[in-house]
């Protein structure tokens, strides 16, 4: 077996000495575990939120979080001035237009201690349960494309392969070719990083779909819809509120996506199953 010291250690992984018990034997070995640290979002010099996250792809995180939370509407409205890392954490120095900074004053609160957040800084139920503009997309994929993306995602999670402790989010084109993957200890963070990566690469998110290695919560559905991703597929189940949001926002929401199997909860017209629709056997 290859030891951690002979493998490439990514910023998202750290080496720890552990006591491993396996097959009736015990040994002290070096093992890789997922890195996690507080990441502070600082807009125009004023702290807004602190998120527990994996210290990789932090510029993508800054942009994706800002877009999915509605802090800015367009990537060009934001500039990451600096990504500063310290022994105890990291800070993202972000510049946004003055009117956007003023709006943040109504939402500001510290979120220290959470691995991701999809309803950050909202002070009312109405603000949390907002519905983004309805998605109008002609995207249609077949079940083979979904299966292809799922298979490709499995092979493109280096931190998960090393540690077994992170989530991943991927974007694939209509043929199921995975173009971007991002990982993080927080499922919301992984999706935010993906959204940021799409924006930085100037990829039109509406021309493909997203796959996540987690459940599909309300926050995940909201972030996908806010980013204009027309189809979100999760390997686990969605929540009832996520389904309601997806129905209202025009988002195709899929759960239990594994190989060629899945459950479509909303707007099924975007997934061609290649079979006649009838009663379950």
Curated annotation (Swiss-Prot):
Task: Name its cellular compartments.
Answer: Cytoplasm
* Family annotation (InterPro entries): Cytidine_deaminase-like, FdhD
* UniProt GO molecular function: sulfur carrier activity; sulfurtransferase activity
Organism superkingdom: Bacteria
Indicate the residues that form the catalytic site.
Answer: 117
| Cellular component GO terms held in the UniProt record | cytoplasm
A GO biological process of this protein is: Mo-molybdopterin cofactor biosynthetic process
Q: What are the alphabetically sorted keywords of the record?
A: Cytoplasm, Molybdenum cofactor biosynthesis
What is an example of a Pfam family matching this protein? FdhD-NarQ
Cross-referenced NCBIfam families, in alphabetical order? fdhD_narQ
Question: Its family?
Answer: Belongs to the FdhD family.
What the protein does comes down to: Required for formate dehydrogenase (FDH) activity. Acts as a sulfur carrier protein that transfers sulfur from IscS to the molybdenum cofactor prior to its insertion into FDH.
The protein's name: Sulfur carrier protein FdhD
* Classification of source organism: Bacteria, Pseudomonadati, Pseudomonadota, Gammaproteobacteria, Lysobacterales
Q: Which gene encodes it?
A: fdhD
